[in-house]
Curated annotation (Swiss-Prot):
Its EC number is 1.1.1.17. Pfam families: Mannitol_dh, Mannitol_dh_C. It catalyses: D-mannitol 1-phosphate + NAD(+) = beta-D-fructose 6-phosphate + NADH + H(+). The keyword NAD applies. Keywords: NAD, Oxidoreductase. NAD(+) binds at residues 3-14. GO terms for molecular function: mannitol-1-phosphate 5-dehydrogenase activity. PROSITE patterns: MANNITOL_DHGENASE. Belongs to the mannitol dehydrogenase family. This is Mannitol-1-phosphate 5-dehydrogenase. The keyword Oxidoreductase applies. GO terms for cellular component: cytosol.
């Protein structure tokens, strides 16, 4: 079995690429980073350091790489069995045109085998979004064949993969031992590939929101509250008892939405929260606050990790005071090397908190929640 994986970064190599390779899938990474592509195609292997209560170094083999802007990647799409991505939500729209070109040439080559495409991104229904973008670039004459032969499979992914510290080996990547990759089994075309570590569900949104409202919400709360107190890493921040209690409270607030929406068992979900708090405190992972907190505008989107759970608490009339504090802390985040953080701070200076909040999150500037966020923001300032 062959796969083309877009994104040869740390998550691509340390998570999806590794799971595919471990399942004896021949993986071709596609990336724009020429030195990375050159080294991967030369070495055809790399090391993954898995850290937790026990540490081990695994070697991933039988991989290669091509430039994602080249004809090579189009040729691979023509003949592959699977396409996966780990490029970040902002890049999906860019690679959509490449995938569309590959599909058109695949159909012209009369390849009638089914193909499944799975976007492994931190976004809700990311593959469905990718499908819509691909179809914009795919000539209408191919749409019926794509509908019949190409499965666009949504997924939920969870693994903490910080930047690697192996300066002597740029391909080596460090990952936590925990990983979760859940896919919507109803969206596959043809045979569903058997890949250990890829779990099937027919209720994907429950898992997507469980991860978004817990891991992602907790992670970003830790980052923004940690930044306020001058912490440099997620572990430093979560070992601050005051922050830990607030992060836990925020995850419980978002968890109440999940319990009401999907009928999750409260005890089981509380255990999931505790497990995530333990992952944040992993002493073997150096996860920088600025890595987690970057791109605050994206992370303040109405379908992302702070606003979506907040909207759920409004829908169900449940507690949200800690989530509101996290949102206020997001507007306090500064990072001169992050264009989104700079843009957000510029808007705050020019427009003030509530107009900026309304513009970037969609929350009504005159709502009770907006006024509370403003009050907390002024207290934090």
């Amino acid at each position: 079995m062959k796969a083309v994986h877009f994104g040869a970064g740390n998550i691509g190599r340390g998570f999806i690429g590794k799971l595919l390779s471990d399942a004896n899938v021949a993986v071709t990474f596609a990336d724009i980073d020429k030195p990375l592509v050159d080294q991967l195609s030369h070495d055809q292997s790399y090391k993954v350091k898995v850290v937790g209560s026990q540490c081990q170094v695994d070697t991933v083999t039988h991989v290669t790489a091509v430039n994602s802007a080249s004809q090579d990647v189009i040729d691979r799409i023509v003949h592959t069995d699977l396409v996966t991505t780990a490029v970040g939500p902002n890049v999906l729209d860019i690679i959509a045109k490449t995938i569309a070109t590959g599909l058109a040439q695949r159909f012209e080559a009369n390849n009638e085998k089914s193909l499944n495409i799975i976007a492994c991104e931190n976004m809700v229904r990311g593959t469905t979004h990718l499908k819509n973008e691909v179809y914009k670039h795919l000539d209408e004459q191919y749409h019926a064949r794509a509908d019949a032969l190409v499965g666009f499979v949504d997924s939920a992914v969870d693994r903490i993969v910080p930047p690697s510290e192996a300066a002597n080996d740029p391909l080596e990547v460090t990952v936590e031992s925990f990983s979760e990759w859940i896919v919507d089994k109803q969206q596959f075309k043809g045979d569903i590939p058997v890949i250990e570590g890829m779990e099937m569900t027919d209720n994907l949104m429950a898992f997507v929101e469980r991860k978004l409202f817990t891991l992602n919400t907790g992670h970003i709360m830790t980052a923004y509250l940690g930044a306020l107190k001058g912490h440099e890493t997620v572990r430093d921040a979560i070992e601050d008892n005051e922050i830990r209690e607030q992060v836990k409270a925020a995850m419980q607030e978002s968890g109440e939405v999940l319990i009401k929406r999907y009928g999750f068992d409260r005890e089981v979900h509380n255990a999931y929260i505790e497990k995530i708090l333990g992952r944040f405190a992993n002493p073997y992972l150096r996860d920088e606050i600025d890595r987690v907190g970057r791109q605050p505008i994206r992370k303040l989107g109405e379908n992302d990790r702070l606003i979506k759970p907040l909207l759920g608490t409004i829908e169900y009339g449940t507690e949200n005071k800690t989530l509101l504090k996290g949102i206020a802390a997001a507007f306090m985040y500064t990072n001169e090397s992050d264009p989104q953080a700079v843009e957000l701070q510029t808007s705050l200076k020019e427009q003030g908190l509530r107009p900026t909040l309304a513009h970037y999150t969609g929350i009504d500037a005159d709502s009770k929640e907006a006024k509370t966020i403003e009050t907390i923001f002024l207290q934090l300032s």
